[in-house]
């Protein structure tokens, strides 16, 4: 099993599946925004950036997955993006489940001055929605609740693959 996990992270197919899943999420977000007219909020924009981190990790892992430093750079980016995305999605769910004037998201995104993405790419990163408003549901779950599940799966798979690449078994000594 350890050898399988080690081998799977060294193949482009696994990394391309990771990138494809994140690309699907990004394209879905743009569909919801531009076709269905659902405006993204500040937390939605941050969750998009976390998803872009997973997408970038998948693309980086596809470059040269046999090289340990490329593979581990991609793994660390994947894990940190999945963790950050899960943390953001949980906070977003809290805004929706416990609406309060004291529990609200910021009115604007807080990008660094050297990368104002909301000004450079406003069609993707400009927030004009309300974090506490539930505008869409599927199977009685809101979009942030689905993102909690998605980022939790990303994080779980990351942990399994990372452990498989850390542990030295009899097969690999």
Curated annotation (Swiss-Prot):
- Where does this chain mainly localize? membrane
* InterPro entries with a match to the protein in the record: DiS_bond_form_DsbB/BdbC, Disulphide_bond_form_DsbB, DsbB, DsbB-like_sf
Q: Which domain of life is it from?
A: Bacteria
The record describes its membrane topology as:
Multi-pass membrane protein
Q: Name one GO molecular function term.
A: electron transfer activity
Q: List, in alphabetical order, the GO biological process terms annotated in this UniProt record.
A: protein folding
Q: Which residues lie on this side of the membrane: Periplasmic?
A: 32-49, 91-145
- GO cellular component labels: plasma membrane
UniProt family annotation: Belongs to the DsbB family.
Task: Read off the NCBIfam families from this record.
Answer: PRK01749.1
What name goes with this protein? Disulfide bond formation protein B
